[in-house]
Amino acid sequence: MKPIIFFVLSLLLILEKQAAVMGQKGGSKGRLPSESSQFPHGQKGQQYSARKDKQHAESKGSASVEHTYPVDAHDHDQTRKSKQYDLNAQNKTTKSEKHPAGSQESFNHKQKGREHGKSKGDFHVIVIHHKGGHAPHRTQNPSQDQGNSTSGKGIFNQDSNTKKRPLAPGLGKEQDSVSGAQRNRTQGGSQSSPVLQTKDLVPNKQPETQNSQVPQNIGSSPNVNETKQKRSSKVQTPLCSAQEDRLQHGSKDVFSKNQNQTRGPNRDQEHGQKAPNRSCQCSSTEERPVNHREKGIQKDAFKGSTSNQTEDKIHDKSKKPVTTPGQDQQDGHKANKTSSRSSGTEERQPNHGKKGIQKFAFKGSTSNQIEDKIHDTSQKPVTTPVQDQQDGHKANKTSSRSSGTEERQPNHGEKGIQKDAFKGSTSNQTEDNIHDKPQKQITTSSQDQRSGQDAKGKSDQSADKEKDLLSHDQKGRHQEESXGAHNIVIIEHEVSHDGHLAQHHDLDRNRLSI
């Protein structure tokens, strides 16, 4: 700080005389645009900017001394003839101008150090560079090159406008249209301290000009902050969609073969938000069990957003058991446009004497788990699902559609097990422990989705589980756990001696047929 203060004091003593001479001779001519043609092409705007900045600084009450000097390697004599002070005694400033690529950063670091000294000391040195240009053309004022007025405001307005354009969409900050000189003079006047500004106007390096002019606005190098905010805004832009999905939908365990489809943009909105026309798009899975006398257990648990996981434990002591639930949807169940669509699941049973168990558990968004303990020792029970939609069931565009589920029975006298458990959005289900030891026992499970369920906008996201393939020596138990007691689950097995015979039953809700 002390070398800077001594340097500024020495320059103040020298430059007061120069500013007085320039104020008497060149100030009045610089203010008039008609008379500004008497100056050379690169110097008239510089002296005018010096006069404007000096008057603005003196009106604020700060004892600032302005001096504008061009630095050109080819024309030092002409600058001295135009009564402008050539500060070649400042070694670092003039040497840094001859090497714009390497020394511009070091000079900006000087400016940052001097700007940091503003908050502690009283004296301020702000040096602004414009690099490039030749003496005969004198294209040192960028405002004149673009046809603007010859005032020094044009320089700073141009730079401030170029700073506004990239920063306005990213940062959203309001930047006033006051030029950089006026803002700098306002800052110097508010502190009421001697401010030395040596402006080195050599153009064609406007990105460096912007970097060196940014410390005029804020004391602690806002250019770094603004560029960090630019980068942070650019980084945050592609993450918005993923973060909004995680904020809206929570962290979801997706066990799927096609995670790109299940994590698509058509995510369902939770917590009672209405999401019409949103489809979860359960990826169409073609399922083929293992050949050659194996027990293929395929579990596709399409789970809702807040649904619990199903545990399917299948104990098959019989050779050919089939259990299938039917749905009874009752009393004004509004499932308008709920998106638990399972699109086109094609199911093919095993070909060579296998026991194929396929289970599709479509769960709703807030559905609890069902627990069906089925111990089947009968040999040939076969049931098929029946759906009863009752009493004002508004199933307009329900997305619990199992669209095009193609089911093909086995080819060689086998009987496959296909269980499609379509679970409602807020349905609770009881536990039924059914031990079937006779050979001719028929049970069929039906689910009752009760009245007043308003499932608009509640959507079901389905995740495909990987299929567990059990060997022919293993035994499986089919168990789906739930904790509710609203729905009555009735399981019904029907005996059929033909492998391809499936008898459809229209069941009442509370009937157990044997």
UniProtKB/Swiss-Prot annotation:
Keywords: Repeat, Secreted, Signal. Its main location: secreted. It is found in: Secreted. GO terms for cellular component: extracellular exosome. Pfam families: Semenogelin (PF05474). GO terms for biological process: coagulation; negative regulation of flagellated sperm motility; sperm capacitation. It comes from the Eukaryota. Residues 50-59, 72-84, 243-255, 285-302, 404-422, 451-483 have a biased composition (Basic and acidic residues). InterPro entries: Semenogelin. Residues 34-49, 138-160, 177-196, 206-226, 379-389, 440-450 have a biased composition (Polar residues). The keyword rRNA-binding does not apply. Residues 1-23 form the signal peptide. Residues 24-118, 133-491 are annotated as: Disordered. Interacts with SERPINA5. Participates in the formation of a gel matrix (sperm coagulum) entrapping the accessory gland secretions and ejaculated spermatozoa. Belongs to the semenogelin family. This is Semenogelin-2. It comes from Ateles geoffroyi (Black-handed spider monkey). The gene is SEMG2.
